[in-house]
Amino acid sequence: TMADRRKALSGAHTDHLLEGTARALMHLNGWSAEQSLAFVEACEQQGMTTKAFYRELQAPLKGERLLVDKTPWYIVDVDILKRVERDFVDPLYIHLVRHPLGMVRSYEESSMQRLLPIATQEGSFGSRELAELTWLLAQQNVREIAKDVPPGRWLQVRYEDLVVQPEAVLRRMCDFLGIAYEDAMVNPYDDMDRRMTDGVATASRMSGDLKFHLHNAINPDAADRWKRFYSEDVLGRETREMAATLGY
């Protein structure tokens, strides 16, 4: 339920994530922050399910636009991923993959180990190991659910291809989604106020890519930047084997 969601995300490092739903309502309905937050609170108090709340998000779209949910943490819980298939009619999946050490480097730069779900358990893993474990768990979960999704509703995209050949990859994604390609798609850092990368208030913490506002253009060098910091020898055997199945 929405109340369960609030309980799960209430915490020093995660409470800002609660604003995502309100921010979406602001964008979809043209509501103020106060209106959106009040609506979410009412949904929580009514015991509304998350499935029903998604229906509230889809209603303003009127079948003319697509509802996109880009929540990376879903991928570490296979039960959440299975609910996507159960709660939606023929959902489309874009599986964005990246070399494990590219992901590790990004997570370490953002100190994302503070937010990693598996990092809440006591252990002696460092930030690099936690990031690698998260990457491996994510790919294992994806493999588990992908076998039950028809190929026509699943598209795998390599991060490295996306930053090196953005237009070609984006055109393929558009064909998959059944939407028209637009030149503005290769300039994601333009019109940032329309990207829903902010919170409901000026002082809100960002709930998406923590480094988004540090960039002004797609940088192809990001594809292999990790090679300056790591050798593939640091990866565990299972991680290397999984990476090989993804073409790395």
Give, region by region, the residue ranges found by the protein language model.
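Short, mixed-charge, low-aromatic patches
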Residues: R5-A12, Q35-A42, P91-P100, S124-A131, ...
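General structural signal for secondary-structure boundaries
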Residues: R6, S10, L18, S32, ...
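PAPS-dependent sulfotransferase catalytic domain
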Residues: E44-L61, V78-D79, D90-V186
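Generic alpha-helical structural element
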Residues: W73, A131, L162, K227-S231
